[in-house]
Curated annotation (Swiss-Prot):
PANTHER family: 3,4-DIHYDROXY-2-BUTANONE 4-PHOSPHATE SYNTHASE (PTHR21327:SF38), GTP CYCLOHYDROLASE II-RELATED (PTHR21327). Pathway: Cofactor biosynthesis; riboflavin biosynthesis; 2-hydroxy-3-oxobutyl phosphate from D-ribulose 5-phosphate: step 1/1. Belongs to the DHBP synthase family. It catalyses: D-ribulose 5-phosphate = (2S)-2-hydroxy-3-oxobutyl phosphate + formate + H(+). This is 3,4-dihydroxy-2-butanone 4-phosphate synthase. The record marks H137, E175 as: Essential for catalytic activity. Catalyzes the conversion of D-ribulose 5-phosphate to formate and 3,4-dihydroxy-2-butanone 4-phosphate. One of its GO terms (molecular function) is magnesium ion binding. It comes from Vibrio harveyi (Beneckea harveyi). One of its GO terms (biological process) is riboflavin biosynthetic process. It is an enzyme of class 4 (lyase). Mg(2+) 2 binds at E39, H154.
Length: 230
């Protein structure tokens, strides 16, 4: 069965994006697949703005354990987060920065509660570089400007979805894994979505949805956005 057929139960490409946007607005999670000729993996995504300890615990329990905080380039620069390495030779050019931890309000930094505290600290509208310790247990990723139209990665897809949902442009992702430790492909991702009542969409869906929609100005103004935290 083709990936298109497997995704039919989640709607048309446009419906899949709009259902994901609605879920994120309501503080829920979504599952994002990248291209079949790329990683072909499902990532569990939540907004930083609405992130809860229960959601973080779900990511740690059901995912790879490497919880990443997706940021715009402007936000990463504002927080003084340099690249993890000078020469990024990873296959997909995944833009990790140095890892981070909140300086206040955490113990070891690895618990779900502590990681949520770190995420909230890094994404609060008046966050400063000195609010964060380096290294830590949260791994920031920097999205390319213009999102999936510049790079078809989960990082860019996450930030695009936050903009489309009119949320703070920061999101959390973690690769979904199977019980045996292997990576979840589309069939396993769909089964997880059914169990947890989550929408599923693809990077291709976001690319198609964004065609004709210009988010570049949103990216340029994404350095700071004041929000009411829930």
């Amino acid at each position: 069965m083709s990936s298109t057929s497997l995704l039919d139960e989640f709607g048309t490409p446009v419906q899949r994006v709009e259902r994901a946007i609605e879920a994120l607005k309501n503080g829920l999670g979504v599952l994002l697949m990248d291209d079949e000729d790329r990683e072909n993996e499902g990532d569990l995504i939540f907004s930083a703005q609405h992130l809860t300890e229960a959601q973080m615990a779900l990511m740690i329990r059901e995912g790879s354990g490497i919880v990443c905080l997706c940021l715009t380039e402007e936000r990463a620069n504002w927080l003084d987060l340099p690249p993890m390495v000078k020469d990024n030779c990873s296959k997909n050019q995944t833009a990790f920065t140095v890892s981070i931890e909140a300086k206040e309000g955490v113990t070891t930094g690895v618990s779900a509660k502590d990681r949520v505290t770190t995420v909230k600290t890094a994404t609060y509208f008046d966050a400063q570089p000195e609010d964060l310790a380096r290294p830590g247990h949260v791994f920031p990723l920097v999205a390319k400007t213009n999102g999936v139209l510049a790079r078809r990665g989960h990082t860019e897809g996450t930030i695009d979805l936050m903009y489309l949902a009119n949320l703070v442009p920061s999101g959390i992702l973690c690769e979904l894994t199977n019980p045996d430790g292997t990576m979840a492909k589309l069939p396993e991702t769909i089964e997880f979505a059914r169990r947890h009542g989550m929408p599923v969409l693809t990077i291709e869906d976001i690319v198609d949805y964004r065609t004709g929609i210009d988010l570049r100005n949103e990216y340029k103004s994404g350095l700071v956005r004041e929000v009411s935290w829930s």
